């Protein structure tokens, strides 16, 4: 291996393809030498316990909770009624906890949240993903459009009831100010409480940041996938949220209308690009880890992603430098023995093999380019370079017997493979490491979080 490395360095000096882009340091991965992780966040406990169907998640390098449950030590997701007294209106029109944040006690909410966190995550050394899924309203007034406009209307009425002497213009301005102040307090203080109680967890809000690039249904061939500038500006205004987050959880769910299309890649790419931008501006010492939420099946269906769309979601997420991807799923996955078998078949076929492909390729790239002290990131984010095992050099083999199933990757990198990686990828060093290949250790670069 040493002589190949020397040849590789010589070839690279000749190529001189590094484009000089500065990459902010990253937080070290959750698990040592695992630069890209795949999580399972679907309620499939019944597949194992009731139907005796093992989805083989660990076989295919997928991190999951005990018994493949929705929440546990690997990843815990908090829905609206699971954490504190979150004020909102649900999808059926039911009112909860004062409806708007300025009409509910923050102290009451935090006290209840503390109890909920202790109950749902009893382990104080929790080291997994802590995801708060609050989607009913957004903390910025101008983003509460469509069905969320009710929160603006309720806020205006709330201000009017308290200050009937004010003009309508002043009432509206006051309503916006009070709403945004209360919304910020609810989201920020909840996050800080969770981080104080379980400081080793990776905490953030699901779907933050968003890109609002959903116009593929109307633009057709004219669709670019780019985040509107106004939405990027609004994301900039949420710096208070990014600074207090310890992870970001955008989503890259694909609707079936995007199946195997150029628009699917545009959609995913720009959502990830925005998340990586926010990750780099949130802190001064390191970029926040990004874990993109995806679905193994097209949204609102039980149709598995095509091979092309696995590349679009999993492959794109890894190549852009995210820390991992989280597969979310519905109760439909475990509703019957047939549905469990369908998930298992997909896992043992294209899905599982592709996950092994990407996670292994990411580890190899980290080892040969970054000395295991960083992860590989595309040099040019808009390129079509992916972290894939080279088919001429590697094989993925699945072995199974009556007691176990395991996946083995066989092969070795050739010189041309190394050159390809160096031409197309660069290192994002973990905290404490620097240099083109993350070869220099510097304790002063590690700051206390």
Swiss-Prot record:
Residues 1-23 form the signal peptide. Snake venom endo-hyaluronidase that degrades hyaluronan to smaller oligosaccharide fragments. In venom, it is not toxic by itself, but increases the diffusion of other venom proteins by degrading the extracellular matrix. In addition, it displays antiedematogenic activity. The keyword Zinc does not apply. Glycans are attached at residues 67, 103, 111, 153, 357, 401. Belongs to the glycosyl hydrolase 56 family. Disulfide bonds join 47-340, 211-227, 365-376, 370-427, 429-438. The keyword Flavoprotein does not apply. PROSITE patterns: EGF_1, EGF_2. The active site is at residue 135. This is Hyaluronidase-4. Keywords: Disulfide bond, EGF-like domain, Glycoprotein, Glycosidase, Hydrolase, Secreted, Signal. Expressed by the venom gland. Residues 427-438 form the EGF-like domain. Its main location: secreted. It catalyses: Random hydrolysis of (1->4)-linkages between N-acetyl-beta-D-glucosamine and D-glucuronate residues in hyaluronate. GO terms for biological process: carbohydrate metabolic process; hyaluronan catabolic process. It is found in: Secreted. Its EC number is 3.2.1.35. One of its GO terms (molecular function) is hyalurononglucosaminidase activity. GO terms for cellular component: cytoplasmic vesicle; extracellular region. It comes from Cerastes cerastes. InterPro entries: Aldolase_TIM (IPR013785), Glycoside_hydrolase_SF (IPR017853), Hyaluronidase (IPR018155). Monomer.
């Amino acid at each position: 291996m040493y002589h190949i490395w020397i040849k590789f360095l010589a070839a690279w000096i000749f190529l001189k393809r590094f484009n000089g882009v500065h990459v902010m340091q990253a937080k070290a991965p959750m698990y040592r030498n695992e630069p890209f992780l795949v999580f399972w966040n679907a309620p499939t406990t019944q597949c194992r316990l009731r139907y005796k169907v093992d989805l083989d998640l660990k076989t295919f390098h997928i991190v999951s909770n005990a018994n493949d449950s929705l929440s546990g030590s690997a990843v815990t997701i908090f829905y609206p009624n699971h954490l504190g007294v979150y004020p909102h209106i649900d999808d059926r029109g039911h009112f909860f906890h004062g409806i708007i944040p300025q009409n509910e006690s923050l102290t009451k909410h935090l006290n209840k949240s503390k109890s909920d966190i202790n109950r749902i995550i009893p382990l104080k050394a929790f080291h997994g993903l802590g995801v708060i899924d609050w989607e009913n309203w957004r903390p910025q007034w101008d983003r509460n459009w469509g069905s969320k406009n009710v929160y603006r209307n309720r806020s205006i009425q709330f201000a009017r009831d308290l200050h009937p002497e004010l003009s309508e213009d002043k009432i509206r301005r006051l309503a916006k100010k009070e709403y945004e102040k209360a919304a910020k307090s609810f989201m920020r203080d909840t996050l800080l409480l969770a981080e104080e109680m379980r400081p080793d967890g990776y905490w953030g809000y699901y779907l933050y940041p968003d890109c609002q690039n959903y116009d593929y249904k109307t633009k057709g061939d004219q669709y670019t996938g780019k985040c509107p500038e106004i939405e990027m500006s609004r994301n900039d205004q949420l710096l208070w949220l990014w600074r207090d987050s310890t992870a970001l959880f955008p989503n890259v769910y694909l609707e079936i209308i995007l199946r195997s299309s150029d628009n699917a890649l545009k959609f995913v790419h720009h959502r990830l690009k925005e998340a990586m931008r926010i990750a780099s501006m949130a802190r001064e010492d390191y970029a926040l880890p990004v874990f993109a939420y995806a679905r193994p099946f097209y949204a609102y269906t039980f149709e598995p992603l095509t091979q092309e769309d696995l590349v679009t979601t999993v492959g794109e997420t890894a190549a852009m430098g995210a820390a991992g991807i989280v597969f979310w799923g519905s109760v439909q996955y475990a509703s019957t023995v047939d549905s469990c078998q369908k998930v298992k078949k997909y896992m043992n076929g294209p899905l599982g093999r592709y996950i092994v492909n990407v996670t292994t390729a990411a580890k190899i790239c980290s080892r040969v380019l970054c000395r295991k002290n960083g992860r590989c990131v595309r040099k040019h984010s808009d390129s079509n370079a992916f972290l894939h095992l080279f088919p001429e050099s590697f094989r993925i083999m699945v072995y199974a017997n009556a007691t176990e199933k395991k996946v083995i990757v066989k092969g070795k990198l050739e010189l041309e493979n190394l050159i390809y990686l160096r031409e197309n990828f660069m290192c994002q060093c973990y905290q404490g490491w620097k240099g083109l290949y993350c070869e220099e250790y510097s304790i002063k670069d590690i700051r206390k979080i």
